[in-house]
Amino acid sequence: MPWPPVFGKVFMSPLQDGFSRRFYYLRLSITDVCNFRCTYCLPDGYRPPAGGKVGRQPFLSLEEIRRVVSGFAAMGTRKVRLTGGEPSLRRDFTAIIETVANTPGIEKVAMTTNGYRLKERAREWFDAGLTALNVSVDSLDPRQFHQITGENKLAEVMDGIEAALAAGFKSVKINAVLLKGLNDHQLDAFLAWIRHKPIELRFIELMQTGEMDTLFRDHHASGALIKQRLLDAGWLQQLRGADDGPAQVFMHPESMGGVGLIMPYSKDFCAGCNRLRVSSLGKLHLCLFGDHGVELRDLLTADGQQDELQQRIRSALVGKAATHRLHEGNAGMTPHLASIGG
């Protein structure tokens, strides 16, 4: 069956790299700005590029977002995740959701958020077409949360999660970056919290980036330790679907919620890669830890550039590597996770 028409054209072939991996999932950063100061991402807060406003590129406009999403949709993309920075800081965020959700071929629109605006906006975003949420909650202890994020807003974030569930979201996931000595002892508290909530808790191993070498050395903890504790407590690892992401998911018969482990240092982590990334300035990134981005923005100025846009994306995909090089201490040119949306 052909893919739906986009800009009057029908495309038959989905995106695929040289290792037979197919890419149905786009992570689209719409801003680098964030109002939190998480130790593992932007410990000093968001700092605009040097030089002030003169010469600084603006983030992708609503029309540029429409064109890039349409281009990916024409090549088989079915899911778009809006990331940042904190995506909800965009004044036109609801319009962005509507634009992406109304793109022919797009079936799921997700966002990753720090959750500080969820309580007031969850219903609005749901009605606009947002279908899934990932909310960052690195600790359930208010003091620890404040220490990790730089903001004393745990209560507001937790209220936002409840508001999202009440608004009708069926897919709510909680992201917690695993930090040795900070939150790696809080597994029992997290499991008790999700026991009666239909959410998936995802522990993410701390990843090495250019500006975080010291933090990585001091606080990296292996997700394998959490995995063993789950198995010992009767949690069952779920079979991974062909189009699932890298998370290893566990369920327990006495828990409504599940647990996902994202362990980029584990064997074969990249084998099932199904996602591509576009930065807030319009660069295509084939890997979170790649060395260079591929410029797309010059092909986002008019609807008539779709053929060229899609060809550039396909050509770039030929060069996608089989795996990252984190085991070699090589994090590419990613200075921090906010720079291309994590």
From Swiss-Prot:
Gene3D superfamilies reported in the protein's UniProt record: Aldolase class I (3.20.20.70)
Protein origin, superkingdom: Bacteria
One of the record's GO molecular function terms: S-adenosyl-L-methionine binding
Catalysed reactions listed for this entry: GTP + AH2 + S-adenosyl-L-methionine = (8S)-3',8-cyclo-7,8-dihydroguanosine 5'-triphosphate + 5'-deoxyadenosine + L-methionine + A + H(+)
Known pathway: Cofactor biosynthesis; molybdopterin biosynthesis
Pfam families: Fer4_12, Mob_synth_C, Radical_SAM
Segment forming the signal sequence: none
Cofactor(s) listed in the protein's UniProt record: [4Fe-4S] cluster
Cited InterPro entries: Aldolase_TIM (IPR013785), Elp3/MiaA/NifB-like_rSAM (IPR006638), MoaA (IPR013483), MoaA_NifB_PqqE_Fe-S-bd_CS (IPR000385), MoaA_twitch (IPR010505), MoCo_biosynth_MoaA/MoaC (IPR050105), rSAM (IPR007197)
Binding site for [4Fe-4S] cluster 1: 34, 38, 41
Key words of the record: 4Fe-4S, GTP-binding, Iron, Iron-sulfur, Lyase, Metal-binding, Molybdenum cofactor biosynthesis, Nucleotide-binding, S-adenosyl-L-methionine
GO aspect biological process, one term: Mo-molybdopterin cofactor biosynthetic process
The protein's Enzyme Commission number: 4.1.99.22
Binding residues annotated for GTP, in chain numbering: 27, 81, 112, 173, 275-277
Residues that coordinate or bind S-adenosyl-L-methionine: 40, 85, 136, 207
SMART domains xref list: Elp3 (SM00729)
Domain (Radical SAM core): residue spans on this chain: 18-247
Subunit and partners: Monomer and homodimer.
Similarity annotation: Belongs to the radical SAM superfamily. MoaA family.
Function of the protein: Catalyzes the cyclization of GTP to (8S)-3',8-cyclo-7,8-dihydroguanosine 5'-triphosphate.
Name recorded for this polypeptide: GTP 3',8-cyclase
Native source species: Aeromonas hydrophila subsp. hydrophila (strain ATCC 7966 / DSM 30187 / BCRC 13018 / CCUG 14551 / JCM 1027 / KCTC 2358 / NCIMB 9240 / NCTC 8049)
Name of the gene this protein is made from: moaA
